[in-house]
Amino acid sequence: VVLIILDDVRWDSLGAAGNATVRTPRIDELAREGIRFEQARVTTAICMVSRATLLTGQYMSRHGITEFGRAIAPEPFAHTYPALLRRAGYWTGYVGKYGIGRPRPDDFDVLRAYEGAHWMDGSSGERIHVTEKNARDAIEFLQARPKGKPFALTVGFFAPHAEDNAPEQYLPQDWSARLYEGVTIPPPLRGDPDYLAALPPFLSNE
């Protein structure tokens, strides 16, 4: 089992969903070779709430994660899918953005969670985007897992979340920038000044 979580991506921001501008070749391949659910909905469109719901299978009113920094307590975590699969004999791992307080190392066989960074130092000292680190850690988990044992890996990619404090909100990696060479990115449909002017100030200023 491999669960991939993307941060702040719209349902139609994938090539597999018919987007002619966005380049998502690997996700498109997964969609072609697997099953694509076209009627799925999130129960609460807030980062940590959705992550807690994915782990627990519960609504926010049940799991109680309503703010950043609040973790799932040990007793309810025992009923999450990683904990249930681990007790059933799966080798479990979590890499990337966790987003629900501080993860406890004992909750997974392999834990490489990191928060609040978009560019990091790689193992050989080079500066890499955290997306690349996510991918490397996931591949290492898959290569090092015990052979003949079922596994469950959750990969929490930061991308395409903006780097909130950066002058340029989206800073591409070299390889991803090459995907868009010669491509004109259309402006957002709701980026028109007339559209923004028609909104109440508390919305148009956000």
Kindly give the residue locations of the regions a language model identified.
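Extracellular/periplasmic catalytic domains that process cell-envelope and extracellular macromolecules
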Residues: 21-23, 29-32, 36, 46-48, ...
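Solvent-exposed loop/turn segments at secondary-structure junctions
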Residues: 8-11, 36, 43-46, 60-61, ...
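Active-site-proximal N-terminal segment of extracellular/periplasmic enzymes that hydrolyze or transfer
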Residues: 1-44, 69, 86, 161
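Catalytic-site neighborhoods of secreted/periplasmic enzymes
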Residues: 53-141, 145-146, 165-176
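A short beta-strand-to-alpha-helix junction
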Residues: 19-24, 41-46, 70-79, 125-135, ...
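Structural recognition of the beta-strand scaffold that forms the well-ordered cores
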Residues: 2-5, 36-41, 47-48, 53-55, ...
